[in-house]
UniProtKB/Swiss-Prot annotation:
Bias (Acidic residues): 47-58
SMART domains for this protein: TPR (SM00028)
Oligomer and partners: Component of the multisubunit TRAPP (transport protein particle) complex, which includes at least TRAPPC2, TRAPPC2L, TRAPPC3, TRAPPC3L, TRAPPC4, TRAPPC5, TRAPPC8, TRAPPC9, TRAPPC10, TRAPPC11 and TRAPPC12. Interacts with CENPE.
Naturally occurring in which organism (per UniProt): Mus musculus (Mouse)
Record-given protein name: Trafficking protein particle complex subunit 12
One Pfam family per UniProt: TPR_19
Bias kind Low complexity: ranges: 9-23, 232-244
Source superkingdom: Eukaryota
Length: 797
């Protein structure tokens, strides 16, 4: 006979999603290409709006000298990009805002054609347009002859871009140094004046970033490994854009126990868990289309055909990729007043609500949640990656994380299988549940499956999404790149497997992650994808799950060892914070409010580790150490003191220590006297009922359970235990009526596995012809429950 107890949910955190993006690095042109227009290079103009006008609109003759303005504007672009900071990081930050400022006064506010706008926004949204190690490209000055020619003729002309400078420090080119190229350019510009007026002007700048389109694939450096196409599970290829899109926000996810608990609250939806990485426009390595703003829309699993997968990267850390060629961005010629460098920066931030404060808030939240202390070997690898300039850091394949699905079979539906066996095909056809193919192939569908308790279908969908990330079946042991997106998917899949009791499958798929300390599981390993971000990409709850899994496989000592390692790191981080340092022990300049938030977070995480250790000790039947561990947890969760003391008392009841259990129950009454509310009174009455159960006084226990039901008629624990008391009092019929009435009253809430197990046991005690009643329960389960229901409680097999 199974007696339901109060379930306690344990807190856990999930790491956020983050930004990533591929990068293309420009290459210097040869001498022969200097005087030819780059028709096959796509270029981006930092100030595209100042040079844009309606198509085929001629330039007015009263405008300023075009050559001077173009030259001055391009030189300012070089000055901006050649700042001491990494240009790649700067461009990534500006691109995330995706705001285009108003042109200076006196300039015509014309926009580029829609296709050009999309290409510019997509490319600026890419987090790594250029590499700080590469030499910036410059535009040579034009001769006075060519300026005169441009001033006389007001039609649109082709302007050729000059080769990149060999020295990055050289920002200005003197007239003597570029005399020969200018003469060649002058003759060519003069000859081009007789061309058609409809020829567009390719706008030149220092960046050469190709837009990922189906007809323009990226060319990656050949690394000897199979490249996989990655389609983002979080964003669609919708081409619509908006004028403004809020900056991407990274928010921590709530506890999985909220959604995987035995009793699900109506206001605890699975959508809450995934909001942190489905409602923000994050930029991912496997998601180069994230830059295209898709406001208030969640995407399907689609991506341009020409995209390359992060799986094509080699096991060694490499930053070089070949530059792809594409069509030149075309826009009509306009000659506004040339803006100053600071005007350009202000134009980018125009219309945003304090973007610097937003970025600071995001970084503080990331720092708190992502902080972790790597091992010495991992720290050395990350330092070599951070300090490398022009070389490549090579890492052994054994030190990388290369996961893949170990099984790809469909999980199926055990409830429907039982219906086919006992009720026939006609009855089984009436069962309609969601599966992995009937929902959107994205996080939206994953949330829907979890909220409907179709966890087996959710496992299948996680496998499909991981396959889209290049980590599917058969990919185990192959090089891959990780994102917070993919690691969240792994965590959800593994948590679902553990919840379904598929411990062996979870262990096999956890194996490639090792001890979760490989260097490619840290943000520092991807400086061009996550510029400036530090910490671990692994969710903290995934570390807890990794440690707890072994106790379900019969290795509780291994679980304790892993939990002790996690506890050591949490204690060290908490000690650093309490000493006024950063999480990693370095100097910190955060505000007092932010420091208090970090201390609170890591105290909560340390308490969560101790809670898992206490559960493991309880499983090992080391009750003395388990009680001590639970008492220690109270220091970190003082608001849960009544629940923890009640749990300790019930543990003592199970081992027969009635007096000590009564002492702890009295302590609960003292604590709850300070609290007002119904829950405190119910907790005290429940403890008294269990105390009488431990003394085999079922009549008194039934009285207290009945009193609880008068105060809270929906209390399933009290209802189930009251029926059990009636059974032990010899009142089988009354016990059956109470359980049946409870199930019929609210099937969705009371079709609990423990309740149904007790009910089927009573059916067997009542009559040898209990199969028909069990089949009736199966029909009720089929109409309400998802595919995660444990059919063993029905005792039909």
């Amino acid at each position: 006979m199974e007696t339901a107890k109060d379930g306690e949910q344990s807190p856990s955190e999930a790491s956020p999603s983050a930004q990533a993006g591929p990068e293309n690095i420009p290459e210097p042109m040869s001498r022969e290409e200097e005087s030819q227009p780059l028709y096959h290079e796509e270029t981006i103009d930092l100030g595209g709006d100042e040079f844009a006008s309606e198509e085929n609109e001629p330039t007015s003759e009263g405008s300023h000298n075009f050559g001077d303005k173009l030259n001055e504007h391009m030189m300012e672009s070089v000055l901006i990009s050649d700042s001491p900071n990494n240009s790649e990081g700067d461009v990534g930050d500006l691109g995330c805002l995706q705001d285009v400022g108003e042109p200076p006064r006196g300039a015509t506010d014309h926009r580029l054609p829609s296709s050009t706008d999309k290409e510019v926004v997509d490319t600026l949204s890419n987090g790594s347009e250029t590499d700080g190690d590469d030499t910036p490209r410059d535009i040579s000055d034009m001769t006075p002859d060519s300026r005169a020619s441009l001033k006389e003729d007001s039609t649109q002309e082709d302007v050729t871009s000059m080769p990149a400078l060999e020295n990055a420090a050289t920002e200005e080119v003197g007239p003597k140094d570029s005399l020969a190229p200018r003469e060649e350019q002058t003759s060519e510009v003069s000859s081009n004046q007789s061309s058609s007026k409809d020829e567009p002007l390719p706008v030149c700048t220092i960046f050469s970033q190709a837009t990922a389109t189906p007809s323009q694939p990226h060319l990656f450096l050949q690394d000897g490994f199979e490249s996989q196409m990655v389609k983002s599970p979080s964003f669609s290829s919708t081409s619509e854009t908006s004028a403004k899109t809020p900056p991407p926000m990274v928010q921590p996810s709530p506890s999985l126990s909220t959604f995987f608990g035995d009793t699900m609250s109506s206001n605890s939806l699975a959508s809450d868990f995934f909001d942190s990485f489905t409602t923000s426009t994050f930029i991912s390595v496997s998601n180069p289309n994230a830059g295209s703003p898709v406001p208030e829309k969640l995407s399907s699993l689609t991506a341009p055909v020409g995209e390359k997968s992060p799986d094509s990267t080699s096991p060694s850390y490499s930053t070089r990729m070949d530059r792809s060629e594409s069509g030149v961005s075309r826009a009509p010629l306009d000659v506004p007043e040339s803006p100053k460098p600071f005007s350009q920066i202000q134009a980018v931030f125009a219309g945003s609500d304090d973007p610097f404060a937003t970025a600071l808030s995001m970084s503080e939240m990331d720092r708190r949640n992502d902080a972790w202390l790597p091992s010495q070997a991992t720290r050395e690898v990350l330092m070599s990656v951070a300090t490398q300039q022009y070389g490549t850091v090579f890492i052994d394949k054994e030190n990388l994380t290369m996961p893949g699905l170990k099984f790809d079979n469909i999980q199926g539906d055990a409830v429907k299988d039982l219906m086919l066996r006992f009720l026939g095909e006609k009855a089984a056809a009436k069962r309609q549940v969601l599966n992995a193919s009937s929902v959107e192939q994205s996080f939206v569908g994953l949330k829907q499956l979890i909220s409907c308790r179709n966890w087996r279908a959710a496992v299948d969908l996680c496998g499909r999404l991981l396959t889209a990330h290049g980590q599917g079946y058969g990919k185990n042991g192959l090089p891959t790149s990780h994102t917070t997106d993919s690691l969240q998917l792994w965590f959800v899949r593994l948590a679902l497997l553990v919840k379904l009791g598929l411990f062996q499958n979870a262990e096999m798929e956890f194996e490639p992650f090792g001890n979760l300390d490989q260097p490619d599981l840290y943000y520092e390993y991807y400086p061009h994808v996550y510029p400036g971000r530090r910490g671990s990409m692994v969710p903290f709850s995934m570390r807890i799950l990794h440690a707890e899994l072994q106790q379900y496989l019969g290795n509780p000592q291994e679980s304790l060892d892993r939990l002790h390692r996690v506890k050591t790191v949490c204690s060290k981080i908490l000690a650093n914070l309490e000493q006024g340092l950063a999480e990693d022990g370095g100097l910190s300049s955060v505000t007092q409010e932010s420091r208090q938030a970090s201390v609170q977070l890591w105290r909560s995480r340390l308490g969560r580790v101790l809670y898992s250790m206490a559960n493991c000790l309880l499983l090992m039947k080391d009750y003395v150490l388990a009680v001590d561990a639970y008492l220690t947890v109270i220091k970190y969760y003082p608001e849960q003191e009544p629940q923890l003391l009640s749990g300790i008392g019930r543990i003592l009841l199970q081992i027969g220590d009635i007096k000590t259990a009564e002492k702890y129950f009295q302590d609960v009454e003292k604590v709850t006297q300070k609290l007002d509310g119904l829950q405190g009174k119910i907790m005290v009455l429940m403890n008294r009922a269990f105390l009488y159960l431990g003394q085999n006084n079922f009549a008194e226990a039934h009285k207290f359970f009945t009193e609880i039901l008068r105060m809270d008629p929906t209390n399933a624990v009290a209802n189930n235990n009251a029926a059990v008391c009636l059974l032990y009092l010899g009142k089988l019929k009354d016990s059956l009526r109470q359980l049946e009435a409870m199930v019929q009253q609210d099937p969705r809430h009371y079709l609990h596995e423990s309740v149904l197990f007790n009910l089927t046991t009573m059916y067997e005690l009542e009559s040898s012809r209990s199969m028909q009643k069990k089949q009736s329960l199966l029909e009720a389960v089929a109409s309400k429950e998802g595919d995660s229901f444990n059919t063993q409680c029905l005792k039909l097999a």
